[in-house]
Swiss-Prot record:
Site positions (Cleavage): E10, S11
One GO cellular component term: viral capsid
Subunit description: Homopentamer. Interacts with the portal protein. Interacts with the major capsid protein that forms 160 hexamers.
Protein family according to the UniProt entry: Belongs to the Tevenvirinae capsid vertex family.
Entry PTM: Proteolytic cleavage at the N-terminus by the prohead core protein protease gives rise to the mature capsid vertex protein.
Source species, domain of life: Viruses
Keyword annotations: Capsid protein, Late protein, Virion
Biological role: Capsid protein that self-associates to form pentons, building the capsid in association with hexamers of the major capsid protein and one dodecamer of the portal protein. The capsid vertex protein self-associates to form 11 pentons, building the T=13 laevo capsid in association with 160 hexamers of the major capsid protein.
Name the record gives this protein: Capsid vertex protein
Organism in which the protein naturally occurs: Enterobacteria phage T4 (Bacteriophage T4)
């Protein structure tokens, strides 16, 4: 607060704008408290271009290891697969007990002769699932016998990884408020702390701007959750349902979205964001709890805990009704996982100070000699472009902050639109 006093004093005692140098102030606590840090991965930067790194864990077929059930380091190794038959409509009729076959790079073993003979399902993938349930075939993930890797010519599967880098330019937001010295004196005379009042005014409005940017970007990059016959268009229709039925249906979809994220990324969802009405439906259904003893675990911005353990955040400004399930995970000191990354630019200040978010400046109007106090915030907001690109060459030219290209591409957050009865407001 003393810094703003110093700014005001400087603006009224300096004879010329060219002589007085604007005083750079650190930052404000109010902004930090209002930013939804629980739904975005935060990585501070002191460079005008924020750099992010991503690690891919790949199998010998250059697939993400977590997206396939295939194993390569055991009895059915990478080279062994070249001799294993691929399952097709024709080959499935020739299989006998003890045979190995592969489907989508996963190896299976036949447990009885002609395992598909009595399965009438025409869809090959579903027929295979039925055969597994009926114990006609099994997944073949066996470890190799010790002797397999003792020979000099044994083939050992490669453990592959790839580190990618992408960059996003830091951008700016700026707000100002005009104040006369007389107004500041009147505020003080009426019991207000004028510097504190002005600081909180600008900081709160700036935090609201950043929050909207984060939430609306999260809506943009999240993949749409579509289920045949239920949410074909990415919307669930609750306009006809009773309150208990609507709550159960929406909570069920939230739980399915949690499982979807875990299957697609191996990470467990850590938060749920919903529009005001969607959050109210979850609360009315009884699936939302907020006990006094939960306060020490619950973020001050959260609405409460869902029954599956996810904190629920309420988006009160959204033009649509929706629910998003997503991941923000801090793994160790350097590794952060999230659907989008928020990188506040700290202008060379202490990166360990969590309050470093923006900077105050005073500019004096040369005509009235009255000061205007402004708050400038710089930050980068980015999604991972490697979830978009078809290949590495294309990925290098994609800007992670280009929300047009990032739309609907993130595997770490899933959105479901919610159709509700329209509210009638009397004029």
């Amino acid at each position: 607060m003393a810094k703003i006093n110093e700014l005001l004093r400087e603006s009224t005692t300096t004879n010329s704008n060219s002589i007085g140098r604007p005083n750079l102030v650190a930052l404000t606590r109010a902004t930090t408290k209002l930013i939804y840090s629980d739904i975005v991965a935060t990585q501070r930067t002191n460079q005008p271009v924020a750099a992010f790194y991503g690690i891919k864990y790949l199998n010998p077929d250059n697939e993400f290891t977590f997206k396939t059930g295939a194993t390569y380091a055991g009895e059915a190794g990478y080279v062994d697969r070249e001799q294993i038959t691929e399952l097709t409509e024709e080959s499935k009729l020739t299989l006998n007990k003890g045979d190995l076959f592969k489907y989508n790079n996963i190896v299976y073993k036949v447990l009885e002769d002609t395992p598909f003979a009595t399965i009438e399902e025409s869809d090959l993938e579903l027929a295979l699932q039925i055969a597994i349930v009926l114990l006609k075939v099994r997944l073949f993930s066996d470890a190799a016998s010790t002797s397999k890797f003792e020979s000099s010519d044994s083939e050992i599967a490669d453990a592959r990884f790839q580190i990618n880098k992408w960059q996003t330019a830091v951008k700016s937001r700026k707000l100002k408020t005009g104040i006369t010295v007389e107004l500041a004196q009147d505020l003080e005379a009426n019991g207000f702390d004028a510097p504190n009042f002005l600081e909180d005014l600008l900081a709160t409005e700036m935090a609201d701007e950043i929050n909207k940017d984060i939430l609306q970007s999260l809506i943009t990059v999240s993949k749409r959750y579509k289920v045949t016959g239920i949410t074909d268009s990415g919307f669930i229709d609750l306009s006809y349902a009773s309150a208990p039925e609507a709550g159960r249906s929406l909570y069920r979809m939230v739980c399915e979205m949690v499982s979807h994220i875990q299957k697609e990324s191996t990470y467990t969802a850590t938060f749920c964001v919903a529009s005001a009405r969607a959050a109210a439906i979850l609360a009315a259904s009884g699936w939302l709890k907020h006990k006094p003893e939960d306060d020490k675990y619950l973020s001050q911005n959260a609405y409460g805990f869902l029954a599956n353990g996810l904190p629920l955040y309420c988006d009160t400004n959204s033009p649509l009704d929706y629910v998003i399930v997503g991941v923000v995970e801090n793994i160790g000191e350097k590794e952060i996982v999230g659907s989008i990354f928020y990188a506040p630019y700290t202008e060379g200040l202490d990166l360990d100070d969590p309050e470093h978010v923006g900077a105050f400046k005073v500019v004096v109007d040369p005509e009235s000699l009255q000061p205007s106090i402004g708050l400038l915030v710089r930050y980068a907001l980015s999604a991972n472009p490697y979830t978009v690109a078809k290949d590495e060459k294309e990925a290098r030219i994609i800007d992670g902050g280009d929300m047009d290209k990032m739309a609907g591409r993130s595997d770490l957050s899933v959105l479901l639109g919610v159709k509700l009865p329209k509210i009638i407001i009397d004029e």
